[in-house]
Amino acid sequence: MKYEFKSFAKINHFLNILDKRKDGYHNIQSIFQLINLFDVITFEQRSDNIINLNCNIENLKQNNSILDAINIFKKEYKIKKLGLDIYLKKSIPIGGGLGGGSSNAAVTLKALTEIWKIKKNNYSLSNLALRLGSDVPFFLNGKNAWVEGRGEIITNVDLKPYWFILIFSQYSVS
């Protein structure tokens, strides 16, 4: 069976960087807004333990957020046999500062809970998300939000619709 998910990008309306934490991260304040730019990730179960990841971008590293999410999920839920064919249709620019990798990781966590019919415990899934990256809990939440702490304190907010013009450089910013 194939499962297909949209993995949305986000913009930061602003980013207020506060004090440095003992864990090496900084506390932040920001408003994150999902935008209508997304990657599409398709998952199909395999009967073996092989994970194949294919992408429309040739140089996508085999060490990426989707595989990181799979590995952390397998360890957390003690899944021995997890074979998947994954196809990532990348539309969010890599290194564009729009959270594409974090969004892909969050979607992967959601997909795996659905594919393996794991009863979701939002607290444990959020902890997994935070281990993958500071933006991942926001994408797991899936709503526009006021974000604080390292990124794990999330308060949903209603935002008016906006039009944005995004300009992408050849240089990576994340």
Regions found by a protein language model. Name each.
Residues 2-82:
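N-terminal beta-alpha supersecondary unit
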Residues 2-33, 118-174:
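ATP-dependent small-molecule kinase catalytic core of the GHMP/sugar-kinase superfamily
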Residues 18, 48, 58, 91-93, ...:
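Residue-level signature for short turns and capping positions that connect secondary-structure elements
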Residues 53, 86-88, 147:
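Generic preference for hydrophobic
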Residues 65-72, 104-107, 111, 128:
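Generic beta-strand or strand-like secondary-structure segments
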Residues 75-85, 111-130:
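Phosphate-handling active-site elements
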Residues 84-96:
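Short pre-catalytic strand/loop immediately N-terminal to key active-site residues, enriched for Gly-Thr
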Residues 96-124, 138, 142:
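DPxDG-like acidic metal-binding loop motif
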